[in-house]
Amino acid sequence: MIPSSLRRGLAALVLGAALAAPSAVADEPSFELVIRDHKFEPETLEVPADTRIKLIVQNADPTPEEFESYELNREKVIPGNSQAIVYIGPLDPGTYPFFGEFHMDTAQGRIIAE
């Protein structure tokens, strides 16, 4: 059995960690990509290097699409008329291609970290 004073201390520690976590995420810069007519807009997205970013992918099409990148090690299906959040980085300076696997002929783009 855990003494009540230890339980209170653990509860305070867990609560403090939970309250501190959202502020760390809020400090990350956010960028938006829109999927429209099976294309990513913008096709090229410039982001800061060495910084973790929040990427908001909005699918304006009625059909699902995927945000996928081998170089970023990310794969996320976004249902039609919805959005998803993908966290990326920190990235070394460079170019990172991404694509939509369901419409590979048109859904292409790249992230440039500078």
Where are these regions (language model features)?
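N-terminal signal peptide c-region/cleavage motif recognized by signal peptidases
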Residues: A21-S23
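Short beta-strand/loop motifs in extracellular/secreted proteins, especially
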Residues: I53, T63-E65, A107
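N-terminal edge beta-strand
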Residues: D27-D50
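Hydrophobic helical h-region of N-terminal Sec-dependent signal peptides
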Residues: A11-L15, L19
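Asparagine-centered strand-capping/turn motif at beta-strand->loop junctions
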Residues: V57-N59
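Bacterial N-terminal signal peptides that target proteins for export
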Residues: I2-A11
